[in-house]
A protein has these predicted regions:
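A short alpha-helix capping/helix-coil boundary motif
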Residues: 8-9, 21-23, 46-48, 123, ...
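A short, structure-level motif marking secondary-structure boundaries and short turns
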Residues: 15, 28, 158-160, 194-196
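Aromatic side chains
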Residues: 39, 47, 83-86, 161, ...
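Cofactor-binding active-site loop characterized by glycine-rich and histidine/acidic residues
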Residues: 44, 51-181, 199-205
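A short, conserved beta-to-alpha structural element at the edge of catalytic cores
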Residues: 181-201
Length: 205
């Protein structure tokens, strides 16, 4: 992992944000992080017992990103998730009962048990789900952003992708198009340092 130092401006802004949020909001955010961690550990246990169909990409250790990102958005904004997205779904307001039902292949799940761990979409809550193709959600975010712009609504699309997806050409093409068209898209690269199994220093120079 590369060592780096935060600029004085970033440190100053960090302290400002902490002050703005206040102790009650910070406690609420911490509680949410604990809930996500507990949920993920339970999901991992069920997966190891063979109760979950399909594969599972956990987000243990990435809870703060999920909670922080969701608190930066507002009701009515859109979410496009990625492979390790359980925490983002929960932070966006998804029901843990319906999420777990989805993992277990039950009809009461968000996608009637057919989407499994990764494809949880809660369209009523503007959570548009994840894509089976690495970085597949990033170009879709351009379409969502264009829709927002054409409808002239005060919304934003948050699209999340990992460091592994950052190697995909579609990510850079999509960012360029969103920039040219001035679209309301927020790109969040959730860098866990290893993607699936490739250390970041070997994937990027």
């Amino acid at each position: 992992m590369t060592d780096f130092e935060l600029s004085p401006e970033v440190v100053r802004r960090y302290h400002e944000v902490i002050e703005e949020l206040g102790p009650e909001k910070l406690k609420e955010m911490l509680q949410r992080m604990y809930e996500i961690r507990s949920f993920e550990l339970r999901a991992e246990k069920l997966y190891s017992l063979g109760k979950v169909h399909g594969t599972m990409h956990l987000s243990v250790g990435q809870e703060a990103t999920s909670v922080g990102a969701s608190y930066g958005m507002k009701k009515g904004d859109y979410l496009l998730n990625h492979h390790r997205g359980h925490g983002h779904c929960m932070a966006w307001g998804a029901s843990i009962d319906r999420m777990m039902a989805e993992f277990l292949g039950r009809e009461t799940g968000y996608c009637r048990g057919r989407g499994g761990s990764m494809h949880i979409a809660d369209v009523d809550n503007n959570n548009l789900g994840a894509n089976g193709i690495v970085a597949g959600g990033v170009p879709i975010a351009v379409g969502v952003g264009l829709s927002i712009k054409m409808r002239k609504t005060d919304q934003v699309c948050l699209v999340i992708f990992g460091d592994g997806a950052a190697n995909e050409g579609a990510v850079h093409e999509s960012m360029n198009m969103a920039s040219i068209w001035d679209l309301p898209v927020v790109y969040l690269c959730e860098n866990n340092q290893y993607a699936m199994s490739m250390p970041m220093p070997k994937a990027f120079n």
